A protein has these predicted regions:
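ATP-binding/phosphotransfer module of carbohydrate and carboxylate kinases, centering on a glycine-rich
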Residues: 1-61, 70-76, 93-103, 115-126, ...
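Active-site glycine-centered loops adjacent to acidic/histidine catalytic or metal-binding residues
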Residues: 8, 108, 134
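Short hydrophobic alpha-helix segments
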Residues: 29-31, 81, 151
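Conserved NAD(P)H cofactor-binding loop of Rossmann-fold oxidoreductase domains
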Residues: 67
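A charged helix-plus-loop insertion that forms the helical arch/lid used to bind
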Residues: 77-86
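Glycine/small-residue-rich loop that forms an oxyanion/phosphate-binding "nest" at active or ligand-binding sites
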Residues: 109-110, 114
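Glycine-rich phosphate-binding loop of actin/hexokinase-like ATP-binding domains
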Residues: 123-178
Length: 304
């Protein structure tokens, strides 16, 4: 069975794993990123970690997931807020030159979407749209087991989709951007405005109040459900995926908003699109497994 190396590079920790073509993690190592010590230090750390993997030289390729937009053609980060010094650095080429092995880099949402499309909730389907609803909102379009990157590598990103112009200006995103209205951060912000900072620490506190029957919390969850439905309907009318795969920390509160969201969504799309399904993400380690699937997607032509 073929095996691949997956690298999950974050601002705090870096993980490297050997993964087989069925998505099983055969070996994994984890170390602090130590980004303050510089780009070269982090790259050398990744190289050292890969070399700790048994049989790494027999793997088919290396895939890396990183936090931020990526030029997937050049294998470079376009913006590296959590990894200072990595912006424009030739990550893929540096790793590939060292190991003489095909190496690919993409952002962490795209690799998670890749993992779900190939091995998780979207397995076997030709067009999968992955959405993660967490601190922010991200998306990835996977067609025939490849992430659609677009001209600038930003295809599939949904955070800035406008769901209602009649909202407040929150940050650099558009007024009414779905991330500012329905992400975990947005739910927390709105919950604090309603209930106070002392009662709301995170979105989970809002969900708990809704479960207790608190009318204001239920109303907020209903509004979030509607806003997400607007986003999903906009995506559906452009992409018409076979399935929406939804992951992220906010899904821990799915019992108080997700069915409502899907019901609203069904009223926003025409009859011919009602067969599009919603599924919850299935992979326990979508980041590192999805990263390992990048070389499988690009190198193993029989899998495409």
């Amino acid at each position: 069975m073929k095996t691949y190396i997956g690298v999950d590079l974050g601002g705090t920790n870096v993980r490297v794993a050997k993964v087989d073509e069925e998505g099983n993690i055969l070996q994994i190592v984890k170390e602090p990123t130590e980004v303050a010590q510089g780009t070269e230090h982090v790259i050398n750390k990744i190289i050292s970690m890969i070399e700790k993997i048994d049989g790494y030289a027999d793997c088919e390729g290396i895939g890396m997931g990183v936090p931020g937009p990526v030029n997937t053609i050049e294998g470079k980060m376009v913006l590296a807020t959590n990894l200072p010094g990595f912006e424009g650095f030739p990550i893929a080429k540096t790793i590939s030159d060292h190991f003489h092995m095909p190496t690919f880099v993409d952002n962490d949402v795209n690799v998670a979407g890749m993992g779900e499309a190939m091995l998780g909730a979207g397995k076997g389907l030709p067009v999968v749209y992955y959405v993660t609803i967490s601190t922010g909102i991200g998306g990835a379009l996977v067609v025939n087991q490849r992430v659609v990157a677009g001209k600038n590598g930003h295809a599939g990103e949904v955070a800035n989709i406008i769901i209602d112009r009649n909202r407040e200006k929150v940050n650099y995103l558009n007024v009414g951007a779905v991330e500012n209205e329905a992400s975990g951060t947005a739910i927390t912000r709105k919950g604090k405005a309603i209930f106070g900072d002392d009662k709301i620490r995170h979105a989970g506190d809002v969900f708990d109040l809704a479960r207790e029957g608190n009318e204001k919390a239920l109303k907020l969850c209903d509004e979030v459900a509607y806003d997400l439905a607007v986003m999903f309907s906009a995506i559906a009318h452009v992409v018409d995926p076979y399935v929406f795969v939804v992951g992220g920390g906010v899904m821990k509160g799915k019992d108080v908003f997700f069915d409502k969201m899907e019901a609203y969504y069904r009223t926003m799309i025409h009859k011919g699109m009602q067969t599009v399904e919603f599924k919850e993400a299935q992979l326990e380690e979508p980041g590192i497994v999805g990263a390992a699937m990048l070389p499988r997607s690009y190198v193993d032509k029989e899998n495409i």
